[in-house]
């Protein structure tokens, strides 16, 4: 009897393993671990709504419509914009309002998988007022009058726990974004300030940005690729090695997570990254990333101390 019961349980586990992924792939809204997935690939006339949570990654699956120009393999950033409501059963199209006007420091990353845009949306860690944004998909043939979309409700935020000392995230912005576009503490020009230094402590969020929201910057790149997942590291000396940040701070979190998807085309548009330093750091360390512009570099150095200064 017991052997028969074990055999039945084993059979049930195999069935769940085989069939659950297929079943989940046909759900419109999926929550798995720390992911919320809006699946508009299989629901091309649908929509989703979610409240943003920094502990969850929000993903949108959009079908690639063949009659569109997708040669550069990027998800068009103008497809994400501030939500202005529904009129006559259609979403109000506000694509002219660039997403950075609403959320300076937002990141969109995209991977192409099975003729599908696999988009991840990372709002910044400072949001000055409650806001709702939408990201839309192209309409498929036969559904031209219907716009599939994901709606994201984002609450006013002042750091992860309202713990910022100022109004901005600690970090180096070699895009020199200022005024309404400012989101990092140090907007700088690499031509006049090739070195930017940040002091950080356990629990801090730090950032880097290489992109200007107002001026086209030729040949901009964030190095090492995948920063802050990968960083140049030193124990407060000037001898650096490239390593995964979790080798030196095991509980550190980085946004976006591009470790498994190098060469992400949308990340080359946004050129922004954040690092959440864990609440416990064993020792003082030094890391850096840089913004590269056709061989010229802006160096962003982060001195991370194990304890806060008294």
Curated annotation (Swiss-Prot):
Domain 6-Cys: 25-157, 168-309
Loss of function: phenotype: Cells lacking both P36 and P52/P36P show attenuated infection and do not form a parasitophorous vacuole within hepatocytes.
Matches recorded under InterPro entries: 6_CYS_dom, 6_CYS_dom_sf, Parasite_Repro/Invasion_Surf
Keyword annotations from UniProtKB, A to Z: Cell membrane, Disulfide bond, Glycoprotein, Malaria, Membrane, Repeat, Signal
UniProt cross-references to PROSITE patterns, sorted A to Z: 6_CYS
Single GO cellular component term: plasma membrane
Disulfide bonds: 38-48, 62-137, 80-135, 172-196, 210-291, 227-289
Subcellular location(s) per record: Cell surface; Cell membrane
Signal peptide: 1-24
Gene3D superfamilies on file: 2.60.40.2860
Glycan attachment sites: 72, 114, 118, 290
Function recorded in the entry: Involved in sporozoite infection of hepatocytes and replication therein.
Protein name: Sporozoite surface protein P36
Organism: Plasmodium yoelii yoelii
GN (gene name): P36
């Amino acid at each position: 009897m017991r052997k028969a019961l074990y055999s039945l349980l084993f059979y049930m586990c195999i069935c769940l393993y085989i069939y659950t992924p297929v079943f989940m792939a046909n759900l419109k809204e999926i929550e798995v671990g720390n992911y919320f997935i809006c699946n508009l690939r299989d629901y091309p006339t649908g929509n989703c709504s979610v409240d943003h949570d920094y502990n969850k990654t929000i993903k949108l699956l959009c079908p690639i419509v063949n009659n569109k120009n997708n040669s550069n393999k990027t998800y068009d950033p103008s497809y994400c914009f501030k939500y202005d409501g529904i009129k006559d059963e259609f979403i109000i199209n506000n694509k002219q309002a660039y997403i950075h006007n609403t959320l300076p420091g937002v990141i969109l990353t995209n991977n192409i998988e099975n003729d599908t845009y696999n988009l991840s949306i990372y709002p910044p860690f400072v949001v000055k007022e409650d806001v709702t944004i939408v990201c839309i998909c192209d309409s498929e043939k036969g559904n031209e009058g219907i716009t599939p979309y994901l709606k994201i409700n984002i609450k006013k935020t002042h750091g992860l726990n309202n713990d910022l000392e100022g109004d901005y995230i600690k970090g180096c912005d070699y895009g020199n974004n200022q005024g309404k576009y400012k989101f990092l503490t140090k907007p700088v020009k690499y031509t006049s300030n090739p070195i930017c230094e940040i002091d950080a402590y356990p629990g801090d969020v730090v950032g880097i940005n290489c992109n200007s929201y107002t001026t086209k910057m030729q040949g901009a790149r964030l190095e090492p690729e995948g920063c802050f997942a990968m960083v140049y590291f030193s124990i407060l000396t000037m001898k650096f090695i490239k390593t995964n940040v979790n080798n030196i701070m095991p509980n550190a979190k980085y946004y976006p997570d591009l470790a498994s998807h190098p060469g992400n085309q949308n990340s080359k548009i946004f050129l922004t990254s954040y690092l959440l330093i864990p609440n416990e750091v064993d020792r003082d360390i030094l890391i850096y990333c840089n913004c590269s512009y056709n061989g010229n570099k802006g160096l962003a150095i982060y001195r991370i101390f194990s304890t806060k200064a008294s």
